[in-house]
């Protein structure tokens, strides 16, 4: 076991104090509305977001931010940070990204991560600070993509455990089944060109926007 792996495990740990557990990314509304009531619908929903949102936006931009931080190309860091913000389709999703990004930034500053307090034209997204942490800890870029995808997936299944609710065993079965998709999603993200990046999931945007007005919620909005 090497130090880079240990740093990656620390970065993707659910215990990392950034507050990701407080958000469901629209999943709470999708469940509450009955959209995912049929067998297999929950896994289908999470798979769709993993492949077409995380895989087409967060992961390929993470790769570009990693390389920009590594090259000290702050104009590129700024550009891709703004690109991610522009692709958050609801106020809720943008607020989540800002809150997680600022939380990781504060943590990184406290851990004396070089460049963590670099001023950008807009508040840092989570993926922006995640990329910087990966660079400073010498985590390989592909490993960092795997770690990000795993962390996102684990958080979604944890949210589903509370919302559906799933039993602990069923949650682990879902997690193990879906983790098999991560290699293909990451490999696809590595191949994408700049003009192919972005997200367009109407159901996710609808769920998130309606969650903002949901009467009773477990998760933040």
Swiss-Prot record:
Cellular component aspect of the GO annotation: cytoplasm
Subcellular localization: Cytoplasm
Classification via Pfam families: UreF
Entry's Gene Ontology molecular function annotations: nickel cation binding
Stored Gene3D superfamilies: Urease accessory protein UreF
Keywords, ordered alphabetically: Chaperone, Cytoplasm, Nickel insertion
Keyword Metal-binding attached: no
Tagged with keyword Chaperone: yes
Primary localisation category: cytoplasm
Oligomer status and interactors: UreD, UreF and UreG form a complex that acts as a GTP-hydrolysis-dependent molecular chaperone, activating the urease apoprotein by helping to assemble the nickel containing metallocenter of UreC. The UreE protein probably delivers the nickel.
Family as reported in the entry's similarity comment: Belongs to the UreF family.
PANTHER family: UREASE ACCESSORY PROTEIN F
Role noted for this protein: Required for maturation of urease via the functional incorporation of the urease nickel metallocenter.
Record protein name field: Urease accessory protein UreF
Gene of this entry: ureF
């Amino acid at each position: 076991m090497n130090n880079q792996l240990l740093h990656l495990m620390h970065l993707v740990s659910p215990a990392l104090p950034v507050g990701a557990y407080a958000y469901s990314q629209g999943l709470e509304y999708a469940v509450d509305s009955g959209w995912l009531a049929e067998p297999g619908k929950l896994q289908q929903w999470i798979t769709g977001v993993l492949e077409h949102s995380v895989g087409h936006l967060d992961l390929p931009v993470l790769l570009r931010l990693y390389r920009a931080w590594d090259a000290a190309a702050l104009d590129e860091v700024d550009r891709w940070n703004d690109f991610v913000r522009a692709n958050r389709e609801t106020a809720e999703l943008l607020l989540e990204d800002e809150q997680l990004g600022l939380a990781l930034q504060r943590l990184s500053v406290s851990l004396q991560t070089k460049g963590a307090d670099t001023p950008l034209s807009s508040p840092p997204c989570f993926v922006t600070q995640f990329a910087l942490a990966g660079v400073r800890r010498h985590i390989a870029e592909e490993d960092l993509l795997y770690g990000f995808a795993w962390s996102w997936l684990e958080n979604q299944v944890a949210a589903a455990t509370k919302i559906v609710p799933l039993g602990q065993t069923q949650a682990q079965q879902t997690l193990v089944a879906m983790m098999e998709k991560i290699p293909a999603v990451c490999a696809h993200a590595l191949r994408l060109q700049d003009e192919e990046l972005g997200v367009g999931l109407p159901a996710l945007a609808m769920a998130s926007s309606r969650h903002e007005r949901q009467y009773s919620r477990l998760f933040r909005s």
